[in-house]
Amino acid sequence: MLSAAVRRLSPLQWAGVGLGSCAVLLALLGLLAPASAFFFPLLSLWASVGLFVLALCALRVAGAELGFFHKAVVFGIWAVAVVYFYWTLSSRSFVYVWDYANYLLKQYDAEAAFAQSAGAGLAYIFGSMADDYTNFITLFTEFPFCLTSHTGDDYSFSQVFCILPTLLVLLAGLVVKVGQILNVKNRMYYFLFGMTLTAAYPFLRMSAVLAQPDWFGLIFGFAIRLL
């Protein structure tokens, strides 16, 4: 009976099992080696993957799951974004000061807190949630920022990998859902037009290339609209 139940698990359920197992391992790492240099990056990777899985769950609950065409368009837009960010960041010289250094400095502070202990790092992230959500973002941007040279441009580019995929998936689900509500006849062209137009909206990328990951909040906004 157990083997039959295991075979009936969906990919999302398997993802949930995997995330749960990784959470246990992370908890053990935090207890046994609280100042480990690997804890914060691994926790960040786990959080980003978990958020992506939750986004897929939101699409399923809303009845707006993506087909092969939708996934291909989303991947294409993401690939264009990677090239765009790389070209923009490598072809300019920008000094990250004032507000433009705010998130970058918070990321440094989060890394310093986790270098003390896992408890100190978690206290830094969640201790100010009632007043300021910006510390929470550092949980998701640490990976792959931890693999870079820790510059402002590196922080901006890291968002393409830790924030944009989940954001695009939810945006795609929202476009699909609106198309269902409006009973669009040619849903393929509608989706292509809707995704291209929305993803090209300048305010989705202008602050991101300036090391301000405020578009992270749109993930929760899109999920709420879907549900």
Regions found by a protein language model. Give the residues of each.
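Short acidic/glycine- and proline-prone juxtamembrane loop motifs at membrane-interface regions
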Residues: 203-216
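Membrane-interface starts of transmembrane alpha-helices
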Residues: 36, 40, 69, 150-158, ...
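Helix-to-loop transition at the C-terminal end of transmembrane segments
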Residues: 32-37, 83-102, 209
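Short helix- or helix-capping micro-motifs
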Residues: 190-199
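Start-transfer (signal-anchor) and selected internal transmembrane alpha helices
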Residues: 1-86
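Transmembrane-helix motifs of polytopic, lipid-linked glycan transferases
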Residues: 157-184
